[in-house]
């Protein structure tokens, strides 16, 4: 089973409406949709977000740098999801193709794209912070496109091995949750994913239009 996981906040709620409409129209094969928002934004959510979809809504006591906090929440999405797989969707993802998302997992392996850092342009900015997280050199960038699907087990294992993950993220100054997840899985859970180097990968049209919201979801 696959749960759809969205971390959002008040500035992205209008965009979230369109995201949810596109999920309702185009996506099948998921177990549930989980949305996590700051507690302080709950009333705004109630007034802005309108959907016929059954949503499992969680509110959290957000603090400090919201951009970093939302990344910690994504790193610990297993706390809110029950399924074997978690599909990350941001509020500014608008799906435009019909798909059963079960087809995105082949033989128990979701696809994760990666590109050598020498070829990623401005995304080189994520290299140093990911290396700090890994405590090792990282050669590849893993935040190639959304949606991304990860094993729930991967997230839970990372948190178990790094019980101070919240402090690590919140005090990092700069962090990239999807690069951290990708780099860790590439080393420790490689057999659980289909890692595809974009040098050898045959281009496939993305499932969604990725818009630019407010740099934190």
Question: What are the functions of these language-model segments?
Answer:
Residues 90-94:
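The conserved acidic donor/metal-binding loop of glycosyltransferases
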